[in-house]
Amino acid sequence: MHYNFKEVERDVQEKWDFTVNVKDVQCYVLEMFPYPSGNIHMGHLRNYTIGDVIARYKRACGLHVFHPIGWDAFGLPAENAALSYNISPQVWTRKNIDNMRSQLKSIGLSYNWDKEFATCDAEYYKYEQEFFLDFLKYGLAYRKESLVNWDPVDQTVLANEQVIDGRGWRSGAIIEKRKLSQWFLKITDFAAELLDDLKSLNQWPEKVKLMQERWIGKSEGVIIDFQIVGINEVLQVFTTSPHTLFGASFIAVSFDHPILKYVNDVQLIQLIDNFDRKDLIDESSINTVEKFGINSGLVARHPLLDVDLPIYVANFVLMNYGTGAVFCCPAHDQRDFDFAKKYSLPIRQVIFPEQNVDLEQEAYVGSGIMGCSGFLDGMTVDDAKKSMIEKLISLGICKKQVYYRLHDWGISRQRYWGCPIPIIYCKKCGIVPVDKKDLPITLPEDIDFTKSGNPLDNHPTWKYTKCPSCGADAKRETDTFDTFFESSWYFAAFCGIGKGIDKDVCNKLLPVDYYIGGIEHAVLHLLYSRFFCRALTRCGYFDVKEPFSSLITQGMVCHSTYLDKYGNYLFPEDGKKMIQEGKYVTVGRAEKMSKSKKNVVHLDDIIDKYGADSARLFILSDTPPERDIEWLDENIEGVSRYLNKLWKMIVDYDQLEQNFVCDNISSDTLEYRINVHKILNDITNDLEFYRFNCAVAKFRELSNVISEMIRLSINHHVVSEAIYILIRVVEPFIPHIAEKLWQIVGGQGMLCNQLWPKVDPQLLIKKNVNIVVQVNGKFIKAVSVPNDIDDDTLKSIALEVAQRRIGNSSVKNIYIIPGRVINIVITKSS
């Protein structure tokens, strides 16, 4: 019987049904749901195949597994498509969903399709509008005018987390600062909790936890009051290094600090107002841009010395962190040092290490003994810090303070294809929340994308409405939610969409047991989801603090790049052809698959040529899931050959015994059976610890063992057991061929519903162990002895083995390391 993967996959997919009652669920497996861009790519294949292996394995372990899928369907690309192709975002999105759903099904993923939804469904976003109203009620949402990150290409505001190295996370455009009225969620209310609870996430990658820890950015320090000279005003400065106060030579404030209202030099005011604030985006960009400052002309009095400190306006100070003002000790802070060098400011050393340091070259940031610091002289840095705080508090000019780098989440976006914010503005009543009974507020369909600016604000009628409080003419909020709002709670929506969130089901199913996705979402989606759990718990929707128990972050799928002599990217097939023709082509390193680099491998082409099982097996072979994997055509061909061999080996074996009995077998046959169960045990352990590539290597080894057993005509009962084990353990990886082979060998029911094979523990017990015999610590020989041998018998064997080395010497002592070594200590005879 020939292996026709297209017939096999089509036949099997028609028979699968993974419907489960959520009230019976014992295990919740979820992958980060896709944006419906139009096609499933290889990164999706890896993500979803990993999740599917876990889901299928857990079902085989006897658990009722919940494995849903949905669509993260709002977003700017749909608007861009509407403009480019003259098609509505709704139509474009639904068409893409239909295509991608078909692709996902062709991969053979064991999804609960009956739970499918898209976040652009009004039934879905109705509930997040309800959440927002409750966030308002509980003080977790508010509106204010603030400096925001403006993406000039996408024409919308971005949250701090969406600005990467000063550029928009999607467009790559350099971000500008603008002042706009925006809606915010108070994620900072949970900053301490979000940070502290990272310790409880034992099954999250340490790298992700570290990224969140740094993003939340707890700083414990003090606020010190500095009196402004000539003005009845105090400047509050935050510092984590109060012990360096005696080394302060200037103060730096943000370009937006309110103290600057006291600057009365017209030219200085113009310089400050005209400063390009695009460099003041986040700490990462501040650390890379050249230090720049303006002497404001204002002066602060040092609180402990009879000196005045000039106040500079500096581009390395952010108004939204701390107090927007810092005192600067150039000798012991590199950033302050660079600034002081540029503007010829004093550098006063107050920390002295054992060896001399050259403060002409760089700041000294290590530990040492305090000096030139009055009452702190001779103290260690830690003691000096405590003493300085006590002194300043006693003077009434200092208080302890904790700040977080984390800022509240700005959720207003000036786009059409998103969830409308349920707010009405009335000239008489002000800000009026929409009544819950009037939800959902839906999007208009007759939208014009040719005009610049906010499409909803440009709509001729949609924004006009009546005030629900007084009945007067009013206007709707025309901004929509940041699309991360939708993805921050979808895992809970699967537990009860259609009636909102089912509290009992959520409390039972959440947190998600296994969550799979890219590490690039560490401080966006993953952090927002943790916040949402806490916010929804505060509002009474459920009682869940963390969204995901176990997090698995997969690496990227990479492919070689090809460039012509002009540096233009080539499609791989064109590059290879040109190389064969002797033309100049540069083969670049393997990079993440990207349309712009023309190194994308299309999933449909692979499935059509090799089949879904080949694609699944390749994407899980060779490389641990957390590492990047390189796509190689020869490897997918090798996987395809293996599947054909597997099929032929099992189909051609004509002595298969369904009711196999493996008793009373020869010792040689027993060794084969022991090996089979050892491999089964290894595969099971590999799956428990997500070592999918190791599990693949092991079941391919098992295939080779079975092939050898068949060639040597080993007992057909033992061979049959091994074949049944092999078919079952490959099913999570290559479910189509496994399901079909199960039918061929007479398996009962559907393979996907069968339990995982049990390892016979007796077969894993070592009958013999190798013991190293030593004399005075030197190797003599390794001997095989029974595992349960007693010490006296072992000593007798060792003495016999070492007799020639012992000779006429006296045995002084014999030491035994159980299961490993026996060492005979001898002394020469006198």
From Swiss-Prot:
Single GO molecular function: leucine-tRNA ligase activity
Record-level GO BP terms: leucyl-tRNA aminoacylation
Motif ('KMSKS' region): 592-596
Domain of life: Bacteria
CDD domains in the cross-refs: Anticodon_Ia_Leu_BEm (cd07958), LeuRS_core (cd00812)
Binding site for ATP: K595
Subcellular location per the Swiss-Prot or TrEMBL entry: Cytoplasm
Reaction catalysis annotation: tRNA(Leu) + L-leucine + ATP = L-leucyl-tRNA(Leu) + AMP + diphosphate
Signal peptide positions (record): none
Chain segments annotated as transmembrane: none
Keywords, in A-Z order: Aminoacyl-tRNA synthetase, ATP-binding, Cytoplasm, Ligase, Nucleotide-binding, Protein biosynthesis
Coiled-coil regions listed in the entry: none
Location of the motif 'HIGH' region: 34-44
Main location: cytoplasm
Uppermost EC category: ligase
Pfam families per record: Anticodon_1 (PF08264), tRNA-synt_1 (PF00133), tRNA-synt_1_2 (PF13603), tRNA-synt_1g (PF09334)
EC annotation from Swiss-Prot or TrEMBL: 6.1.1.4
Keyword Thylakoid attached: no
NCBIfam families (UniProt xref): leuS_bact (TIGR00396)
UniProt similarity note: Belongs to the class-I aminoacyl-tRNA synthetase family.
Protein name: Leucine--tRNA ligase
Lineage: Bacteria, Pseudomonadati, Pseudomonadota, Alphaproteobacteria, Rickettsiales
